[in-house]
Structures are given as structure tokens and as C-alpha cells.
Amino acid sequence: KKSDWEIRTQDRRFSLIESHKSKQKFQLRPDIVIQNENIIMDTKWKIIDETDEAGNYGISQADMYQLYVYAQKYRSKKLYLIYPQTDKFLSPSIAPFYYNT
């Protein structure tokens, strides 16, 4: 049902450090959280090259670490990085990545 969808933008419920001198530190802020399905999405304004498999398609290691932290804190297995379409990234043709846990 459409009314069951709760979408949060720039969600700020969690921090990387929950208690340091009784304060939260390093606030997490995924761009989109679909709560009823526990889906985390983060938008990136970077150029992806779907032909550059050796260079991880231009996906940064820092972005993958960030998504991993979101997976842990939100207890989510459905995580997406969203990139703009360019002449080197025309369709979502890159195979999914799976974290080695």
C-alpha cells in the first residue's frame, strides 16, 4: 500500500560514534531511507565509467566504506549508490556488488 511507505531524506538517527563523553560523533546521513523496506540509498555526483572494471568503474573506496557503515547501523541488506547518467554510464549495467561479511 502506498500509505505504508515512509521515506526519509537526509536521515540523522545514527552516528558512527554513539558515545564519546556522552555525545554522539560523526553523524551518519544517508540521502534516502525507505523505512518500511529498510532500503538505504545514497546519491553521488561523480562520473562513473561502466567500461572501467579494473578501476572499479570509478566508484570510490570511501563511498563503499560509507555504504558499509550504513548497512551496519541501519541493519540493511538493500543498499544503493545512485549516480548521474553520462555518456560513459548509460544504463544500470554494472553487476551488483556484495559485501564480504
What is the predicted role of each segment?
Residues K2-T101:
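Catalytic core segments in nucleotide and nucleic-acid processing enzymes
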